[in-house]
Amino acid sequence: MTAHFTDRPDPTRADARLAKASTWNVGTRRRQRAAVDAIRKAWAGREWPHPGLLSYSVYAGEDGATLLHYSQWTGEHAYQDFVREGRDLRNAEIDAAVPGIERLELHTYELYRSGLRAAGDTRQTGCLVIVEAEFDGPDPARQRAWVDTVFEALGEAAELPAGGIAAHFHVSTDGTRVINYAEWESAEHHIAALAAPGDGVGSPSPRWERVHDYPGMTGGGGVHRYTPALSMEPGVGG
């Protein structure tokens, strides 16, 4: 079973019990490109490492320095097996090609709620927007209640902003974080949606004020835009 390269993962796939997300700081756009090439080579040249790994995707940060890694797993045991048996060889090859990569925190998530693309919508995801929210302590009920509050605020709009495709809210298994994995046609569409007068995404309203001022939020996190760089899954027949 080898890697099959695809255009994007499916965050809503039913067999994905967990998602892992982390960031690498590689420093420059040139090193971003070199790291993506090294990742592709390291994975294409080996057997798929574990049947419990359902997809692995890499996104290039708009900042020209970072790479976001998003992977889907059948469960934590599958990930731990991969760490023991398959991660080091790949990372060693990547590090040899691009020395000095800074690997930042890895977080584990479960998909909680999605705003899905409409039936028949075949638009390509040209920009991934990650919106992070952090809370002052573990509270799974609070995570989910905050996401529900976001959906209530989004429900005020008659339709998605131009260029918006889908939003997938993930809650961390430690109870302290939420990310919105938001698919957009382009970065320009997302920028325009934020800047839209009066009714832009997150514009002042009682419901959006509840989102921004939710009890226990630390003010950490932020909004980050990425360009899809690489996505893969097990080959057919594996």
What are these language model-derived features?
Residues 1-67, 74-238:
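Short S/T/G/P-rich N-terminal loop/turn motif that feeds into the first structured element of a domain
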